[in-house]
Each structure stands twice: as structure tokens, then as C-alpha cells.
């Protein structure tokens, strides 16, 4: 036995320190056992230590540990199925937990493409600096917006390295996103793409806020081999066991929002470009933000307060912008046929009470004196508001409208207006809601929606 990082009689802790630092093969259970051991030894040592010694230890931030250690059994962070099921049953239901509604909405409307087109307009205003153009996607979803934007980025910056961070809590959406990436690595090989389940206040820096979560950080690097999109796709598909373990979620008892069980970071790049990307590939604890562009498309519930949206989402992302960096935020704003349909069923429904002007006002207050370092552009309605539509044929909305079209229009309307399932039970007992849907479709010759956008940019 020798003196080591954890004190005398600590066994094999050199390897453990490396694992903690790299976020590799350290479960939450292991991290908690270490913390418990430290706490118990702190209590024991404080009984024998003098006030002077305690003061010095607190000042230096050191801890002395002693005692025998035993071999640790391999543990896993996975929760029993019964426990997960019980917690899921007790939590509040959230409208965007329903995968069926989400996928139906995504595949029957062109919102994703419209958001990507709006984001692409920001590219001409960027002023990236070496070693890479840095992009943060605050809510990657199924990767549709990101991959559309990457095509536009390649067109404008064909040889510039890309560093892209996508924040996504949903395992299903991460899988869908990975399916879209092989072609992106073929077209733009100088890309480093990072996917994480960290919170908005943590994701830009790829660093958990709490010590406990940081100790259990699940960091995985994947260097893709080969020279074809097929080979890259096969290697990304093989990551599924890692995703299943790293993207487990639990529900907040207060809000019902999903929270990660274990913080995870997945770093992907092409092995044959690792030399070129050496200064771009992130290392644990060494990511400093500095993003050239950040996209926040529909990252919150419409009914949440402006203070919540700013404090939990907007302010952390704005602070992560680099010099001349830009944040594009997009949210639904209503005043469209979809809201008209919802108001036919629920006349007093007002889901979009917080507009872009209110968000900017609260954001200025949240930033305080730092607000003078940013430009806030809400724009006029003609520039800030853009429209997207549900896919329909002209013949489908002229005379007799098919049932599938009615259901698709109804689903898209209640999804955008964020109507919870429990409120739908009484409405779905009759066909009156389908009659209202048909009336709105015929009146407007289709179904369309309004989104509004605003930009916050850091001054140079």
C-alpha cells in the first residue's frame, strides 16, 4: 500500500481517477459509493482534527481518507422495469410525450423544412473563427432541421470544419437522427457531431452542473471507419446498446418533464480526418461554448411563463454564444386556421400568450448588465412570422374530404396548440370535431400554421 490520490490504503485508485476524468465505465451507483465513502471519512476525520486543521483542509479543498477497500462488483445504472413503470404512471402527462402525434405531425407538415430555410438565412451573417464553425441545436428532434441546415452550411462553407452539438433527451429521436448522419459525413467529412442529453444550462458546455452527475458522465467517442455512407450507417446502428443505457429518462415530479438518469455525450467523427480535427474534437471538461450559431426551435411548452422559458432555455444558450454569435429562436404564435379549429371546440383556449416581445423583455432583465453585450432583434411581423402548411392535394379539400385528411388536420391542430389527451376524451366521443375540421379546411382551402422567430446576437 502507498500514499495515493485518495490517501493511504486506497486500492487501484489511479485507474479510477482516469475513468472519472474521461467519463468512461463509471455508473451512478459507483459514483454515489465514492461520495458516500468520502462523506463518512470526512465525519470520522473531523472528530480527531483540530479547528485549525479543519480550516486548512477547507481552504485547500483537500480530503484525507483511510480504511480498507473491497473489490467492487460491476454495477449498472439501469432501473428495474417495475420502478420505471410506476414512476411513469405517477407523472403528469405531457402532450409531446405522444410519439404517434409527433410523428404524424412531422410527416404531414413542412414545418421542419421552413425552420431550416429560416435558419439558413443566418449563415450569411456568421463570422466563424478557427478552428471550426460551431453550431448548437437546442432540441435536435429527429434531426430533420439539423441535416437540412448542414446541407446549407456545406454549400456556404464547403471546406471549413464543423463542430455541431445537438441536445436531445428522446432516445427515439436520437435514433432517427443517427440514421440521417451517414450522408452528412460523406458530403462534409470535416465534421464533428456531438449528441447529448444534458440540460439546456449544461449542454452548450457538455458539462453537468452537479458534481455527482459530472462524476458519472457517460462520454463516448466514435471514430467512423471506411469510405462509404453504408459503412458509417452500420457503425452508427451498432451504437444502440450504448444509447439504450445512456438515454434512460425519469420524470420530474413537479412538471412531468423528462430528466436524464445519467448524463451522456456521444462524439462522432471520421477517423480518416481525426488529424485535421484534433483541435475540434471535444475533451471532457474542456468545451468553452463560443458558438457561431444556435437554433432553438420549439424548445418549450407554449403555456410556460416567460421567466421559465428565459431562465431555463434562452439565457444559458445566449451566454454560450461566441463573438458575433447568433441565436435564432422559433415558436408557434397562433392566429391561424389551426387555432381557429381549436377555438371552435374550446372557445376560451389561448395557448400562445407569451410572444417574442415578452421573451426579449424578460431576457434583457435576466441578463442584467450583460445585456449591453447583445443585440436583440424581434423584427416586424412581416419579417418575423412565417407560415408552414399541412400537405394536402387541392382535390382533397374542395368537396368531400377524406377521413384520413380530417384526422391528420385535427391531429396537427391539437399538437401545435398543445392540447393534453385528458381534455380530448369528451370531445372524441362524437363526430362534431371532424365537422369543425372539415369546415376550417374548406374555408381556408387547406390548413396552415404561424411560427414567429427572433434573433439575439453577441456584439463583437
Where are these regions (language model features)?
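A short glycine-rich, Lys/Arg-flanked "PGG" loop and its adjoining helix->strand segment in the class I
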Residues: 286-288, 308-324
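Class I SAM-dependent methyltransferase Rossmann-like catalytic core
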Residues: 86-130
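N-terminal, positively charged/glycine-rich alpha-helical extensions of SAM-dependent methyltransferases
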Residues: 65-101, 229-246
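Conserved class I S-adenosyl-L-methionine
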Residues: 130-143, 164-165
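Conserved beta-strand signature within the Rossmann-like core of class I S-adenosyl-L-methionine
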Residues: 324-332
